[in-house]
């Protein structure tokens, strides 16, 4: 049957519809808001896939160009691989739902979200989260939670649910909040140096919106929800667990001590203890024994945190690992930094380019989009001592790069102050947790070292959480094991004045805003400590860019002169580029950017452009060239392509009968501009001769 439920979020209304489309899926919901329409389906395999080793959940989000009345650009007119925006939205959907599936559930599950109609003023990705939550809720998939997601904007201290593109661009804060009726499960944000209190207010506002949407989903469940398939999470054999614990606890506790052992040495010791312990078990117990060993490893970690109040490497809960910073480490690179924090190390480089180097983006929203600042994050296998393929960026790398880019964007100067395209690349050379935060810190340092006039450094810190019941421990600057066995990965980036980027993922059903408030304050203290180290290494941006970077010179011309610079079919501008070897970008408002690594070439191009676009000024003297003689005077070129009339009466101080007695074509003479009448320029040589004679007379006196 066809069912519709409407949710009111104040200025925005969301409609949930099911029973008309994709009826063979386990769950299918069409979400509408304005002209935006998103179809989300949830499907599950009948049999589990235990060989996967992890929950085999796949999320695919597609923004079809037909949704915006467009045809894909380029030669291939069919949608191809996912765009960066689509990949990030896949992660945005995956992260809040993954921890809510039952422990040990191994049936392949797939979420597909398709944007069928695009509203020119609304981002559909928050609707995709809502559709996913609704599709799972009404399906027979054993997903027991009702959750929702919402985008929150803030302007003039007021929070807005699902702001429009226009509102989002004007917003001081852009945050996506996902939560159940009981608490928060995921947060992702970009901001303009906002306070912790403002962020917390946005999260609380977003959670209230999530509750309203969840109530609508519950209403839909009552109308058409299927009976959930039975699933009981597997439990460990207590007898085998006790034997594994007896054999391994002492040695395993020592192996996990990273204050005593470095990361790779710890891994090797753990593997050795595991091998010895499992080999001692009967063959029929080995598979269960391996699971018991992994559970024991996690149990030791959590007991150390909550009962002994001790981290694996011996740090205090709010202590940050040792930081070392080197700037300018690569000679030919425009900007570079080697940032090391504990056993995590990032080599971050900056390349400066021109407007031609901007990243063009094809989006559903109207108009053309491009990026002049981009950050690319790489995670090669050697960073964790492994062998692997060097393929293109995966979803994780794209997600980490987007977080770092978002955190730094708030401090990137506008094009009017710094007309360069900037590409930051963060290569993770070593990793033991918080590598994305190393990308942010290293990126800020490398940008300043490259001469990008940022007004402040941006630092980042990853927070963790270990929680059981009412007991919990919040950790600052988490290492790899703390991320793996902990319950939260909460990344916070910003300046001394406020937060610019944030991302939170959890492995428990939800956390309260009270815990988030405490974590934000602890993160603020950690961020300030890191920023102090960064300012010691690079107090402010270099005043000059690298000698190997292109110099960009900016000049402004009248808009009616643009055609003179470009010429018919681009002939003139191509000629300037071929003659000087520079790059030239002309904007519609008459702004011209000339880029070249060679100053002389740039100056030559600027002079040509200045000559092409120059306008005569009354009373000013010019060195002109006689280009044509006529009976009533001569036409003199004072700028390339710009002639003025030198009347016969203005050629000499005495009366002349024939112009050719005084001038011939090709002569270079000094002339003064007497008057401007529309496009006509009146010149005088007589006035210049008179001035010269009077100066000579004064000199003799």
Curated annotation (Swiss-Prot):
Catalytic activity: RNA(n+1) + phosphate = RNA(n) + a ribonucleoside 5'-diphosphate
Amino-acid positions noted as binding Mg(2+) in the UniProt annotation, renumbered to this chain: 483, 489
PROSITE patterns, A to Z: KH_TYPE_1, S1
Presence of the UniProt keyword RNA-binding in the record: yes
A single MF term (Gene Ontology): magnesium ion binding
Compartment(s) where it occurs, according to its Swiss-Prot or TrEMBL record: Cytoplasm
Superkingdom classification of source: Bacteria
Family annotation (InterPro entries): ExoRNase_PH_dom1, ExoRNase_PH_dom2, ExoRNase_PH_dom2_sf, KH_dom, KH_dom_type_1, KH_dom_type_1_sf, NA-bd_OB-fold, PNPase
CDD domains on file: KH-I_PNPase, RNase_PH_PNPase_1, RNase_PH_PNPase_2, S1_PNPase
S1 motif domain span: 619-686
Record EC number: 2.7.7.8
SMART domains (alphabetical): KH, S1
Keywords: Cytoplasm, Magnesium, Metal-binding, Nucleotidyltransferase, RNA-binding, Transferase
Keyword Magnesium recorded: yes
Residue ranges of domain KH in the record: 550-609
GO CC list: cytosol
Family annotation (Gene3D superfamilies): GHMP Kinase, N-terminal domain (3.30.230.70), K Homology domain, type 1 (3.30.1370.10), Nucleic acid-binding proteins (2.40.50.140)
Family that this chain belongs to: Belongs to the polyribonucleotide nucleotidyltransferase family.
Function: Involved in mRNA degradation. Catalyzes the phosphorolysis of single-stranded polyribonucleotides processively in the 3'- to 5'-direction.
Protein name: Polyribonucleotide nucleotidyltransferase
């Amino acid at each position: 049957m066809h069912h519709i439920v409407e949710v009111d979020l104040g200025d925005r209304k969301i409609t949930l519809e099911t029973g008309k489309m994709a009826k063979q899926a386990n769950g299918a919901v069409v979400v509408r808001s304005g002209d935006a329409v998103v179809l989300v389906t949830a499907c599950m395999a009948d049999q589990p896939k235990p060989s996967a080793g992890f929950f085999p959940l796949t999320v695919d989000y597609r923004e079809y160009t037909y949704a915006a009345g467009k045809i894909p650009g380029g030669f291939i007119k069919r949608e191809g691989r996912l765009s960066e925006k689509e990949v990030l939205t896949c992660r945005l959907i995956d992260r809040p739902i993954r921890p809510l599936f039952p422990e040990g559930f191994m049936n392949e599950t797939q979420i597909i979200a398709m944007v069928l109609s695009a509203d020119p003023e609304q981002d559909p990705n928050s609707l995709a989260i809502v559709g996913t939550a609704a599709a799972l809720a009404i399906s027979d998939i054993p997903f027991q939670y009702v959750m929702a997601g919402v985008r929150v904007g803030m302007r003039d201290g007021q929070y807005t649910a699902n702001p429009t593109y226009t509102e989002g661009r004007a917003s001081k804060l852009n945050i996506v909040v996902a939560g159940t009726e009981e608490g928060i499960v995921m947060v992702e944000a970009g901001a303009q140096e906002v306070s912790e209190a403002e962020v917390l207010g946005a999260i609380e506002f977003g959670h209230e919106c999530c509750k309203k949407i969840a109530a609508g989903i519950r209403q839909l469940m009552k109308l058409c929800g299927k009976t959930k398939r039975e699933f009981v999470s597997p439990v460990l054999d207590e007898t085998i667990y006790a034997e594994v614990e007896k054999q391994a606890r002492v040695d395993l506790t020592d192996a996990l001590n990273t204050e005593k052992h470095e990361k790779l040495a710890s891994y090797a010791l753990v593997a050795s203890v595991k091998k010895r312990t499992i080999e001692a078990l009967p063959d029929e117990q080995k598979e269960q024994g391996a699971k018991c060993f992994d559970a024991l490893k996690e149990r030791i970690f959590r007991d150390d945190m909550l009962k002994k109040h001790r981290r694996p490497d011996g740090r205090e809960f709010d202590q940050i690992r040792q930081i070392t910073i080197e700037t300018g480490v690569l000679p030919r690179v425009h900007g570079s930094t080697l940032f090391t924090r504990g056993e995590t190390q990032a080599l971050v480089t900056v390349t400066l380019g021109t407007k031609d180097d901007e990243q063009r983006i094809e989006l559903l929203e109207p108009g053309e989009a491009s990026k002049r600042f981009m950050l690319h994050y790489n995670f090669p296998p050697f960073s964790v001592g492994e062998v692997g393929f060097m393929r293109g960026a995966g979803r994780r790398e794209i997600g980490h790069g987007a977080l770092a880019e978002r955190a730094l964007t708030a401090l990137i100067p506008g094009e009017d102050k710094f007309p360069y395209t900037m590409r930051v690349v963060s290569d993770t050379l070593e990793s033991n947790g918080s590598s994305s935060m190393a990308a942010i810190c290293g990126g800020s340092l490398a940008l300043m070292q490259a001469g990008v006039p940022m007004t402040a450094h941006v630092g980042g810190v990853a927070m963790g959480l270990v929680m059981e019941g009412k007991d919990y421990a919040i950790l600052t600057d988490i290492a790899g094991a703390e991320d793996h066995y902990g319950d939260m990965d909460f990344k916070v980036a910003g300046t001394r004045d406020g937060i610019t980027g944030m991302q939170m993922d959890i492995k428990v059903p939800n956390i309260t805003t009270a815990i988030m408030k405490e974590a934000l304050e602890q993160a603020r203290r950690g961020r300030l400590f890191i920023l102090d180290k960064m300012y010691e290494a690079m107090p402010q941006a270099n005043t000059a860019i690298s000698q190997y970077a292109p110099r960009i010179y900016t000049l402004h011309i009248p808009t009616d002169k643009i055609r003179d610079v470009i010429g018919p079919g681009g002939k003139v501008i191509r000629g300037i580029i071929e003659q000087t070897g520079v790059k030239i970008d002309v904007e519609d408002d008459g702004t011209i950017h000339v880029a070249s690594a060679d100053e002389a070439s740039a100056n030559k191009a600027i002079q040509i452009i200045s000559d092409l676009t120059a306008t005569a000024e009354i009373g000013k003297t010019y060195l002109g060239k006689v280009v044509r003689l006529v009976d009533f005077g001569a036409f003199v070129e004072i700028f390339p392509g710009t002639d003025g009339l030198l009347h016969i009466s203005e050629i000499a101080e005495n009366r002349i009968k024939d112009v050719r007695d005084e001038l011939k074509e090709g002569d270079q003479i000094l002339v003064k501009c007497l008057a401007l009448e529309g496009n006509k320029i009146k010149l005088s040589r007589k006035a210049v001769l008179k001035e010269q004679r009077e100066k000579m007379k004064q000199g003799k006196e």
